[in-house]
Design a protein with these regions (language model features):
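Blade-edge beta-strand/turn elements of extracellular beta-propeller
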Residues: 49-50, 99-102
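Non-membrane alpha-helical segments in proteins
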Residues: 1, 21, 191-202, 260-267
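Long, acidic and serine/threonine-rich low-complexity regions
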Residues: 435-438
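A eukaryote-biased sequence property
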Residues: 259-263, 303, 307, 311, ...
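Elongated alpha-helical scaffolds that mediate protein-protein interactions in large eukaryotic proteins
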Residues: 1-48, 54-67, 73-95, 109-114, ...
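Alpha-helical repeat/alpha-solenoid scaffolds of the HEAT/ARM/MIF4G superfamily
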Residues: 124-250
Length: 456
């Protein structure tokens, strides 16, 4: 009941302050897990009230509301997200949009702008990337600006903060004798950087959807805005690559901040594989060596680059670039490890990208000079394992095609002479190829039937 009455309190009144303090106490106590539907609806009402305060007030309560909103909405996989998505009214979304505009457009300390950008990331996480470019307005809201200006405002604000953080983190890591920052301060900057990277990744996805015509009908973003956004993203990715170059120059290849940098580079190059081509080509071998804090060997750094690799290897030059430093071995190793993820389902999307990359290289192996080596035996076993987890024709045919290409490099006698490959594995390989041929025959028969049926 309190939340529904807040909108009736006079702006800046003592009642608003007291209500806000009460909500602050609740926010730090409440957890949405295992809540009843009624209580979740109450939390959703709290979010609605906080969104209104965040939008319309210009006192300290505005920023308290911002902090409470980010605390509530940043909880991962919270049932509250579902309750908010099912709300019939979108006014709360527009209030949050208005509050974000107000914070980003005015002279506000960097920490509050970071909170506003975190809130934007939370909204895109809960409601989808297209939230940023949907045309929502609230009557009598002076903070309303066009969708295009809002998209660019959020992106440019994020870009500025990323540039500052990259510089500060690099200085604290590589100029430690001149830096007075504590480890906690550096860790906080790295966490903030990860949040901003996540926001920019979502913007990349939104821009990609809008430019390809796959966005929601409510998107009204203009082509000129898309081009401005792409120009800005190019500049930011170039800065991220410079950050990675600094790490390479200082012999640093382990760290979650470096892995996060690789991830955002991979996300952008998935959409524009030849952007920043010179810097990327120079750094690709180093990127493949980067490890997260909890990794004992590189894995995710290669996996994040697979969408780009599957595209550049369609050309002979791209294949030569990858093979020149043994990058194809890293891709094969990544594929093998994806089939060994204990307790988790195999990510078919990443597997297809890895297979496409290897198939592209194998197709151009005469120009790439790829000899038969033991790691190909491990690749065969991984493909057999992958195909054995499903009846999906796409998996069976892709795995079979790549196995066949590998076998063209060698002979049955050589394969059986390898200690890790026995007659049982060879039978499994034969069964896979037979399954693939049955799939081809089935599709051929169906195609013939449909063709004849069309002439009937």
């Amino acid at each position: 009941m309190l939340f529904s009455q807040i909108s009736n309190f006079p702006d800046g009144s003592r009642c608003v302050e007291l209500a806000t303090h009460l909500m602050k106490l609740l926010v730090h106590k409440l957890r949405a897990e295992n809540m009843s539907v009624e209580k979740l609806q109450g939390m959703a009402s709290m979010v609605t009230s906080l969104a209104m305060l965040f939008d319309v007030l210009h006192t300290a309560v505005k920023f308290e509301s911002l902090h409470m909103l980010t605390a509530l909405l940043s909880q991962k996989e919270s049932p509250l997200h579902g309750a908010l998505r099912s709300m019939p009214s979108t006014i709360w979304e527009s209030h949050i949009r208005g509050g974000i505009i107000d914070v980003l457009q005015n002279r506000v300390v960097s920490s509050e702008k970071l909170q506003a950008l975190l809130l934007a990331e939370c909204m895109m996480s809960i409601l989808g990337e297209n939230w940023l470019s949907e045309d929502h307005t609230v009557l009598n809201n002076k903070n309303v600006i066009s969708v295009d200006k809002f998209v660019l405002l959020v992106l440019e604000s994020a870009r500025v903060e990323v540039a500052v953080l990259l510089n500060e983190i690099a200085f604290s890591k590589y100029e430690s004798s001149k830096s007075s920052q504590t480890d906690d301060a550096i860790s906080q900057k790295q966490r903030n950087l990860a949040i901003l990277f996540s926001l920019i990744e979502r913007i990349i996805k939104m821009i990609s959807d809008a430019s390809s015509g796959e966005g929601e009908p409510s998107q009204t973003i203009q082509e000129r805005t898309i081009m401005q956004a792409i120009t800005g993203l190019n500049e930011t990715i170039s800065l991220v690559l410079d950050f990675l170059q600094d790490a390479k120059d200082h012999g640093q290849r382990k760290g979650d901040d470096l892995l996060a940098a690789v991830r955002i580079v991979g996300s952008y190059l998935a959409e524009t594989p030849y952007a920043c081509q010179e810097k990327t080509g120079r750094l690709l071998e180093f990127i493949f060596s980067i490890e997260g804090e909890d990794e004992s060997r590189p894995f995710y750094s290669v996996r994040f680059m697979l969408p780009m690799l599957s595209q550049i290897t369609t050309t002979a030059d791209g294949c030569r670039t990858l093979v020149s430093f043994g990058g194809h071995k890293a891709v094969i190793d990544c594929l093998i490890n994806m089939t060994k993820q204990n307790g988790t389902m195999i990510d078919n999307g990443s597997m297809f990208l890895a297979c496409d990359t290897i198939i592209n290289i194998m197709s151009k192996r005469k120009s790439s000079h790829i000899p038969m080596e033991p790691y190909f035996i491990c690749l065969l076993q991984a493909l057999i394992t992958w195909a054995g987890t499903t009846d999906a024709s796409s998996v069976i045919m892709t795995a079979s095609s790549l196995c066949t290409m590998v076998m063209e490099l060698t002979s049955e006698e050589f394969v059986l002479s390898c200690s890790d490959f026995d007659s049982k594995t060879l039978r499994s390989l034969s069964d896979l190829i037979v399954r693939s041929l049955h799939q081809v025959r089935f599709f051929y028969t169906m195609n013939m039937f449909l063709t004849l049926d069309g002439f009937a």
